[in-house]
Amino acid sequence: MVKQWNLINRGDLFTGTEACEVSRSVVGADVQCEEAWKLSTGDPSIIVAVLDEGVCQTHPELRDNIWTNEDEIDGSKKDNDGNGYAGDIHGFNFVTNTGIITWDDLNDTGHGTHVAGVIAAQNDNGGIGSIAGGTPDKPGVKIMSCQIFAGNAGGNYMSSVKAIKYAADNGAVILQCSWGYTSGTANSYEWGTPGYADEEQWETLAPLEKDALDYFTHNAGSPNGPIDGGIAVFASGNEYANSAGFPGAASMCVSVAATAADFTPATYTNYGPGTNISAPGGDRDYYWDYGEGALRGEAGCVFSTLPYNVSETGFGYMEGTSMACPHVSGVVALGLSYAAQQRRHFTADEFKKLLYETATPIDEYIQGTKFYYRYAYDLGYTNPTQMMLSNYTGQMGVGQVNAKRLLDAIAQNGTPMRFPNLYIPLDGEVTTLPATFFLNGESLTYTVTIENQAVATSRTEGAKIIFSGLKEGSTKASIAASDGTTHNFNITVRKSASGSGWL
């Protein structure tokens, strides 16, 4: 973890030098993973959709945590599962409109692979660490690649809209979006035309984007899983501006500002209105005194996975609110993993409330003056400069995301999961996994009792219980676990049933 202060910060990485006598790292200025991992390291039932460049699916750190659409055929030009997308075995390329995810365009930066590594690189395998990537023995969360950038192409309005809906419809509960429009208060000399001024303007001029995000936040997840609804996480932007960029600044989203290894705002981060929470994003200009040549300041950035066509080692440093964003996505994924393992259920709003309430307060560190170096592109040299931290006090959202406090809160909140009411087509079947609704369910056995077996019957096949619809009507039923827990539920059989199984 020496290079990953963002996950475990011992406060000893950036000690004083001749050029910089003040330590620029603080113990615990990370996302508090170390203690959280004692509770959970991730769960494969949680899917994170990465809307970005394509994620390198063959990377040794990521390949075991790539989402697979089991009902699709790799490389197929036919829509085998009927979801409207052909060949979407690991996600979909919304740039080329195919199921072939790419990460090797000459102009690709590895951005999508880098953010994916922060969330779900596999731990304890000799490579890097991640927030929710699990271990070789305990699989972590899954990454669904929704490709909206490819080299110099992509990133248009409709590709992101389609990707957001695709993610909701195919099982993702978290949107990881390290992109957005320029802040509405950005300096026009440096950044060109400012972006949307407020949420009303964004809703008026980008209505399909708003509708897609509403769709995700309300329709992702399940009323019978750890979360009903979805969490859309966006970068606040890198324009040094005093308001976050949209779509992240919209009320249904989580907008993430960036911090350095001492809890201070990253020099480039957007902040203020629209900003919800902070996370480590790296700050190369702040750590310019550390390292030599091309390596200057690198250690103050975020270390993660990269495609091998971008980095010969498969790893590298990046910075930005783009890198802060996946820390929040990763902590949300870790929290939902723990909720799934503890069989706790939340609405999306309830979960976001816990995310905010458990953040680490950081205003005590945002005082005085912060000195850094900034490259002046119009002048062609690096210029020493400073920022008044008082401008950022109370403006970095609720504080820094805290995995351990979130997981502790999850154990004390939400509602217990219940075996769901079933909706079965006449002469059809619905397959259930009862272990997912009972604490420590994998170690239990189950007995189903159906009051009216003329309406429906059940049979057990390994870990599955399969229900068959025999006659139109309804009946009460119960499922008893070997630990003494019993859940009551209803079964309805209809000709018009969709076969989804859940009422």
Where are these regions (language model features)?
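Catalytic-core segments of hydrolase enzymes
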Residues: 49, 115, 173-298, 303-304, ...
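Hydrolase catalytic cores
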Residues: 118-119, 144-150, 165, 173, ...
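Gly/Ser-rich catalytic serine loop of serine hydrolases
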Residues: 106-113, 205, 237, 314-329
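Surface-exposed intrinsically disordered loops and tails
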Residues: 10-29, 67-85, 90, 96-107, ...
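Subtilisin-like serine protease catalytic core
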Residues: 34-157, 170, 180-185, 227-228, ...
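Primarily auto-inhibitory N-terminal propeptides
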Residues: 1-21, 34-37, 165
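Extracytoplasmic soluble-region selector
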Residues: 412-503
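Catalytic cores of secreted or luminal carbohydrate-active enzymes
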Residues: 399-413
